[in-house]
Swiss-Prot record:
Record protein name field: Cytoplasmic FMR1-interacting protein 2
UniProt entry keywords in alphabetical sequence: Apoptosis, Cell adhesion, Cytoplasm
Cited function: Involved in T-cell adhesion and p53-dependent induction of apoptosis. Does not bind RNA.
UniProt keyword Nucleotide-binding present: no
Keyword DNA damage: no
An annotated GO cellular component: cytoplasm
PANTHER family: CYTOPLASMIC FMR1-INTERACTING PROTEIN-RELATED
Lineage of origin: Eukaryota, Metazoa, Chordata, Craniata, Vertebrata
Similarity comment text for this entry: Belongs to the CYFIP family.
Entries under Pfam families matching the protein: CYRIA-B_Rac1-bd, FragX_IP
Gene Ontology terms describing biological process: apoptotic process; axon guidance; cell adhesion; cell morphogenesis; cell projection assembly; regulation of actin filament polymerization
Molecular function, one GO term: small GTPase binding
Subcellular location: Cytoplasm
Length: 1253
């Protein structure tokens, strides 16, 4: 039966798809996210103690005491948190400045309203510390009673008392440190007294007591000391507590860093409490009751330990403030000022790395079989296999704890020993205390060591977290097997002996242990067990099947078993003879071994919590102690002083490749701190501050990382594209242009879901956004750089674009960027506009700089800047100063490319024209050509036309070519006289030639652009040939057939033939595009299209004024001697610029280049006057005569021979120009006029015949 689903349900189901996790191949370079699952806590705090009625009643009672003491320790922890996280309220409240202030009552009322709940907490704290001291002293008094001094006291009980000692030390130090607490209470007290809130004597007395309690330093310690000293034998119990801490510390009977540091603090504070008026620790040491030398060694190895948050304690201070220190100072080495090797983390790194590699290798072996293959929970393992996994889990936790403790210990030592400007030259004298303790207190090597250790801790946490279910299974199986084997099997022999020897007390303890923990196969103890009767097992043995289950003991059950086992092997007992003496040596050894191993059972049963605690580095962020020291000057410290950001920023600033993959691990310290602030401190404001810092730091992180990645790939592209010969030549001269060192950004670029403060951040997307912006800015900067320079810089623009294109290609392997063409169009402002910034600037440069200021040299085929500019160089905007990576990638690359580019800077030639063709494309070139034609039109129909009209007027009306008999000197003098007005025309060599130069340069630009465009098109055609099935003819041997070889070649390249491929696989639109592209590529060169022909035709249309051709000839054919046509005027101009100049003068070619001749010759050709010019040119006639007579005289200050040489050079140049122009014009004429127009003239008749006729 089909079910109907509504549209709303369907849409909601689709929305739910977004929440499905999609596993990817993202490299794991960050710590594990907080588990969504609940963390089960099976610690009942002995609430189920009454269920174990079979246990020894004394230990059940002791469990009751434990329970109440643990509750008091939890309450003490809450007050420690309250004190540590206390922020001054009174500083934020307006102060009453004088008694006459009108709103003082309102201020005082608000002060009381705000501070009363806080003062109530302080009052409760004072009562609590009294109650805690009283409770502790009562326990000490009870245990030190004369009748109970020889009673057995369990290690767990002694450790609980040790935790009390630690709590007193911590609370007292916190109370001493917090001046803001005293200030807030004073402000409240002042306001309350004014408002008469405390009228009754009891309230006044309590307030006074609180004031004294807060004001007196070490008040808790003093009260505790005073009350302990009146208890007889208290030092014996404290000695037991200190000794158990020494033993635990020495044998590494701790797991978490906090447990390790607690043992040391209890040793130190315990010694301080023991050393007083009543007892002397040095006498106790002499009696071997305690071992001061061992404690001294511990304190020398670890001089500073964390006290609470960022508060640290120097352990030697407990010794130095003890009563009998001065006379026994020589016995202590820990009080001497020396740095322990423990704090040199760089030297420790060799061992840490070795431990890490060994453990990771072993863990990977299990991980591959358990997690990757999925056989972890399904397969049943042997006890040995479970034991191996159990040991592996324990060793992993111990390693993590060791590394975390090491980091915290070095950090603590640095906080206690801040640097200064003498120790660190980078540290300014005005640096704050916290800044000197964090920002300037670590060398680069120490920061890297910190990062590496943190990465090891967090990385191993990930691996062990993945195997949590496997470890938990193995832990429960192993603990169950160990307990059951020990209780059901190992304890049979001592029970048999105890029954046989009738040791009732021992029997009761052993039976209590078995009844407390045993899980019998049949549900009850076998009644026929011979050991219960003290008998030997039968010869075949008594078969006891111990079951196997994955069930661990409860916390109370484990406590009862361990305590009862401990009572069997303890040196103390309530009776004269200890129970230990009733047991055999091997049994005692077995019990001791089991008791030692079972110490870690509690931690391992709570594996998830233990793993989190062993990896907790949250205290690296908290700074309440140092904030308190600023006395309100700082609300919070900047990120530059925050350890997580210091470490992260150090990696980013140094760009160390080996550390780059660790960059996310320091940021996880914020996760630790935020978790601690919410779950342990339970302070929202601390979390808010962490979150605010994370927001700022992560923005900075993405900003810096994105810039680094872009700079790296830009430098890589610049290095790849740098000319190899140039690099080799630099190397020969000792200049090394390095490649950027390989870095590991790829792993970071694959991060799609970075976990930070519960957020899943797509780092790849954020980096993509910034790099897209950087790429756009880089392209914009390249174009802006081109816009700020002349036309020669277009070569540099292409290089910059090529480097950016390669950068884009490299980055696109990891990031989803827009296409390069789209980015370039956007930067070029060419998205919707028909032409972009490049095209506009090319035309702008052509119009305002290139045409008026460049001279063309036909020999080199280059334009160079004129020696004498006739126009001012245009003003260009300077490009903005940017980082080197926005140009070529780095400073060395910028210098290298600048040197290469300098060879293209002083001319405009074929490289520049090819670049213009590639960058502007057909559309851009068409725009530029159109605008150039407008300039040429305005010149030919404006300035040039006016000058032509003026010069035609000053030309001689008739100027015949003199006969050869006059000789070249005479002819020169004749022409000089005839053209005197032209020669002396002031504006001829300036404005007239300048205008013609601009026309000539424009024509030349069009010609050279077409030549460059043709080369580019040929290149495109050759590249496209294999994809268009255009194959070269192959070489064939004798006897071979060409058709067969060609068919074989066509078959080989058939997969590359694009059009059939698209026709078979593409859409109709794609097929149409492919066909059109194929047709365009094939036909654009085959058609023989010529742009320059069109240009010349358009220019010819601008020469419509009659002045260009002159009036109709009187003879009806042509003007011979009359100077009315343009070619005669150009002959006169040519005569002028052929006259040699003086020594320090510039020639016409230096000032105007060949562009001047191109303009004149082009106009002559377009007017159809080339042959007349060749026949009637004044200079050519002079050259012809001079070549015949070979004379060399100076006529009118003009050296004849030099002038003839110049004429010859220009004649050659003119012929070349005419040849080029005629090549294009003849094709035009042949196309336009297929019929040749012939005009017939009557033959000439002699005058004598004419008269006769």
């Amino acid at each position: 039966m089909t079910t109907h689903v509504t549209l709303e349900d369907a849409l909601s189901n689709v929305d739910l798809l977004e929440e499905l996790p999609l596993p990817d191949q993202q490299p794991c370079i960050e710590p594990p996210p907080s588990s969504i699952m609940y963390q089960a806590n099976f610690d009942t705090n002995f609430e189920d103690r009454n269920a174990f009625v079979t246990g020894i009643a004394r230990y059940i009672e002791q469990a009751t005491v434990h329970s109440s003491m643990n509750e008091m320790l939890e309450e003490g922890q809450e007050y420690a948190v309250m004190l540590y996280t206390w922020r001054s309220c009174s500083r934020a409240i307006p102060q009453v400045k004088c008694n006459e202030q009108p709103n003082r009552v309102e201020i005082y009322e608000k002060t009381v309203e705000v501070l009363e709940p806080e003062v109530t907490k302080l009052m409760k704290f004072m009562y609590f510390q009294r109650k805690a001291i009283e409770r502790f002293c009562n326990e000490v008094k009870r245990l030190c009673h004369t009748e109970r001094r020889k009673d057995f006291v369990s290690e767990a009980y002694l450790l609980t008392l040790g935790k009390f000692i630690n709590m007193f030390a911590v609370l007292d130090e916190l109370k001493n440190m917090k001046c803001s607490v005293k200030n807030d209470h004073s402000a409240y007290k002042r306001a309350a007294q004014f408002l008469r809130k405390m009228a009754d004597p009891q309230s006044i007395q309590e307030s006074q007591n609180l004031s004294m309690f807060l004001a007196n330093h070490n008040r808790i310690t003093q009260c505790l000391h005073q009350q302990l000293e009146v208890i007889p034998g208290y030092e014996e119990l404290l000695a037991d507590i200190v000794n158990i801490c020494v033993d635990y510390y020495e044998n590494k009977m701790y797991l978490t860093p906090s447990e390790k540091h607690m043992l040391l603090k209890v040793m130190g504070f315990g010694l301080y409490l023991m050393d007083g008026n009543v007892s002397n620790i040095y006498k106790l040491d002499a009696k071997k009751r305690i071992n001061l030398s061992k404690i001294d060694k511990f304190f020398k190895q670890l001089q500073v330990v964390p006290l609470f948050g960022d508060m640290q304690i120097e352990l030697a201070r407990y010794i130095e403030t003890s009563a009998h220190y001065e006379e026994n100072k020589s016995k202590w080495t820990c009080t001497q000022s020396s740095i322990s090797p423990q704090y040199n983390i760089c030297e420790q790194m060799v061992q840490i790395r070795d431990d890490h590699i060994r453990f990771i290798s072993e863990l990977a072996r299990y991980s591959n079989s358990e997690v990757v293959t999925g056989s972890g929970l399904d397969s049943q393992k042997s006890d040995e296999e479970y034991r191996e996994l159990f040991d592996l889990a324990l060793r992993g936790l111990q390693l993590l704890s060791k590394w975390s403790a090491h980091v915290m210990e070095v950090y603590s030592w640095k906080l206690v020993h801040p640097t200064d400007k003498f120790c660190n030259k980078d540290c300014p004298g005005t640096a704050e205390e916290y800044e000197r303790a964090t920002r300037y207190n670590y060398t680069s090597e120490e920061k890297f060591a910190f990062v590496e250790v943190i990465a090891m801790v967090k990385g191993l946490q990930v691996l062990m977290g993945r195997m949590e279910s496997v470890f938990n299974q193995a832990i429960r199986n192993t603990i169950y097997a160990a307990l059951q084997d020990f209780a059901q099997s190992s304890l049979r022999e001592p029970l048999r002996q105890a029954v046989r020897k009738k040791k009732n007390v021992l029997i009761s303890v052993l039976q209590a242990i078995r009844k407390t923990v045993c899980d019998w196969e049949a549900g009850r103890e076998p009644p026929n067990d011979p050991c219960l009767r003290g008998e030997k097992d039968p010869k075949g043995g008594f078969d006891i099947n111990v079951p196997r289950r994955a069930v661990g003991p409860s916390s109370t059950q484990l406590y009862m078993v361990r305590t009862m086992l401990e009572s069997l092997i303890a040196d103390k007992s309530g009776s004269k003879k200890t129970l230990r003496s009733s047991l055999d040596g091997p049994i005692v050894q077995a019990i001791e071994e089991f008791h030692k191993q079972s110490f870690f059972f509690t931690h391992l049963l709570n594996f998830s919590e233990a793993l989190q605690q062993c990896c907790d580095l949250s205290q690296l962020w908290f700074r309440e102690f140092f904030l308190e020291l600023t006395m309100g000057r700082r609300i919070q410290f900047p990120i530059e002083m925050s350890m997580p950001w210091i470490l992260t920023d150090h990696i980013l600033e140094t760009k160390e490749p080996s550390m780059m993959e660790y960059v996310l691990y320091p940021l996880d310290l914020y996760n630790d701190s935020a978790y601690y602030a919410l779950t342990k401190f339970k302070k929202q404001f601390l979390y808010d501050e962490i979150e605010a810092e994370v927001n700022l730091c992560f923005d900075q992180f993405v900003y810096k990382l994105s810039d680094q990645i872009f700079a790296y790939y830009k430098a890589m592209s610049g290095s790849v594209l740098l000319d190899k010969r140039f690099r080799a030549e630099c190397k020969n001269y000792g200049v090394i242009i390095p490649y950027p060192p390989s870095n590991r950004y790829e792993t970071l670029l694959k991060q799609r879901h970075v976990q930070l403060l519960g957020r899943s951040i797509d780092l790849n997307r954020l980096i993509t956004q910034r790099i897209s912006a950087a790429m756009y800015k880089s392209l914009d900067q390249a174009i802006s750089r081109f816009e700020s320079e002349d036309l020669t810089s277009i070569v540099e623009l292409e290089w910059l674009l090529d480097i950016n294109r390669l950068t884009h290609r490299l980055l696109s392997k990891h990031l989803t960027l827009d296409s390069f063409d789209a980015m370039f169009r956007e930067a070029n402002h060419n998205v919707s506009a028909p032409y972009g910034r490049n095209t506009l600037h090319v035309f702008w440069e052509l119009n305002f700089d290139f045409l008026p200021n460049y001279c063309y040299n036909g020999s080199t085929n280059r334009f160079v800047r004129t020696a004498i500019p006739f126009t001012q160089e245009p003003q260009r905007d300077k490009p903005a100063n940017v980082q080197p990576y926005y140009l070529y990638g780095s400073k060395p690359l910028n210098i290298a490319y600048s040197h290469i580019y300098s060879s293209y800077r002083n001319f405009v030639g074929p490289p520049h024209f090819k670049t213009i063709c590639r960058l502007l494309g057909y559309q851009g070139i068409a725009v530029v050509m159109e605008e150039l034609l407008k300039i040429v039109k305005s010149l030919l129909q404006g300035t040039v036309l006016q000058y032509v009209k003026t010069l035609i007027e000053v030309m001689p009306k008739i100027c015949r070519l003199p006969r050869h008999e006059y000789g070249s000197p005479g002819i020169l003098e004749f022409f000089h006289h005839q053209l005197k007005d032209i020669i002396e025309y002031a504006e001829l060599k300036t404005d007239v030639f300048q205008s013609l130069r601009e026309v000539g340069n424009a024509i030349l630009f069009c010609l050279l652009i077409e030549q460059a465009l043709s080369q580019e098109e040929v290149c495109d055609l050759l590249h496209a040939a294999p994809f268009q099935n255009i194959l070269p003819r192959v070489y064939i041997k004798e006897g071979e057939r060409l058709e067969v070889r060609m068919k074989r070649l066509e078959a080989k390249y058939a997969p590359l033939h694009l059009v059939p491929l698209i026709e078979r696989l593409g859409t109709p639109q794609q097929i149409a595009i492919a066909r059109e592209g194929d047709l365009l590529t094939k036909e654009r060169l085959c058609c023989g299209l010529s742009m320059f022909e069109v240009i010349l035709t358009r220019i010819r249309s601008y020469l419509q004024d009659p002045i260009w051709r002159g009036p109709p000839p009187t003879n009806g054919v042509m003007h011979v001697d009359e100077c009315v046509e343009l070619h005669r005027l150009w002959s006169a101009m040519q005569f002028v610029y052929c006259i040699p100049v003086g020594t320090n003068e510039f020639t016409a070619e230096q000032c105007f280049g060949d562009g001047l001749n191109w303009a004149g010759c082009a106009i002559i050709v377009l007017l159809g006057q080339q042959r007349r010019f060749d026949l009637f040119d004044f200079c050519y006639h002079l050259l012809k005569v001079q070549r015949q007579d070979g004379k060399d005289e100076i006529i009118k200050n003009v050296p004849l021979k030099k002038m003839a040489d110049r004429i010859r050079k220009y004649q050659i140049l003119n012929n070349e120009i005419f040849a080029v122009l005629n090549k294009y014009m003849k094709s035009v004429e042949s196309d336009s006029s297929t019929v040749e127009h012939v005009r017939c003239f009557q033959p000439p008749i002699h005058q004598s015949l004419a008269t006769t006729c």
